[in-house]
Design a protein with these regions (language model features):
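Short catalytic/ligand-binding loop motif for oxyanion handling, primarily in non-cytosolic enzymes
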Residues: 29-33, 114-117, 174-175, 193-195
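Asp-based phosphoryl-transfer active-site loop
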Residues: 15-37
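Substrate-recognition element of Asp-dependent hydrolases with the DxDx(T/V) motif
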Residues: 70, 82-123
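Histidine/lysine/aspartate-rich catalytic loop segments that bind and position anionic ligands
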Residues: 109-143
Length: 210
């Protein structure tokens, strides 16, 4: 099923559905504390074990050169059932709904694409990658820069950037995406950084509100 321009949202009648949705991770699909309190400490605590077990491999030698060991430590953690990605309870249902409507969903995060795939590949609600059409990281640009969102729009083949809905918890990212022409909503989850009092973006506390 293809979502066509002008198609109405049958659930709430609010107007046309987006062709694509681009999601941030921390504070949007996933609690900020998961990254800060689980992923980062796990990588810190297991770097020695990882290097001892894999030091002779070409991958680890490349990792050391390119400073990307962290993602591979996490990969081992997921494979060994020591890590499990965490998403908010409203996320799986929304992803399934958007997928059924033919809306393509992408992730844009400062974390590497490997780290993104790991989080969504093994979550507290199972493997959610089947609902995701692609992943963007900072190779496309800084998330607070307008050009990054222009690059994403061009990469997705979307001629009208406002056909893309971007969800983030970071005000500066919302400003950049809006300046690039995207539709924007801000995720206002528990524990997220407070927004400026004079901000004018639509805010949501759950994907069920979209």
């Amino acid at each position: 099923m293809v979502v066509k321009e002008g198609m109405n949202n049958s659930d709430n009648g609010t107007g046309p559905l987006p062709r694509c949705i681009v999601l941030d991770i921390e504070g949007t699909t996933t609690p900020i504390i998961f990254v800060a309190d689980v992923l980062f400490p796990y990588a810190h605590d297991n770097v020695g074990r990882h290097l001892s077990a894999t030091y002779e491999t070409a991958e680890t030698h490349d990792d050391i050169k390119l400073l990307r060991t962290q993602g591979h430590i996490w990969r081992t953690g997921y494979e060994n059932n020591e890590l499990e990605g965490v998403v908010y309870g409203d996320v799986p249902e929304a992803l399934e709904k958007w997928h059924a409507l033919g809306i393509k969903v992408y992730i844009y995060s400062s974390g590497s694409r490997l780290a993104q795939r790991l989080i969504f590949g093994k979550t507290n609600y199972g493997d959610l990658r089947k609902y995701l059409s692609g992943f963007f990281d900072t190779k496309v640009g800084n998330k607070k820069e307008i050009r990054s969102y222009i690059e994403i729009s061009e990469s997705l083949g979307v001629n009208k950037p406002f056909d893309i809905l971007f969800l983030t918890d970071v005000f500066q990212e919302a400003v950049a995406a809006k300046a690039a022409g995207l539709e924007v909503m801000i995720s206002n989850r528990p524990g997220n950084t407070p927004l400026p009092d004079d901000q004018s973006f639509k805010t949501i506390t759950s994907f069920a509100e979209i």
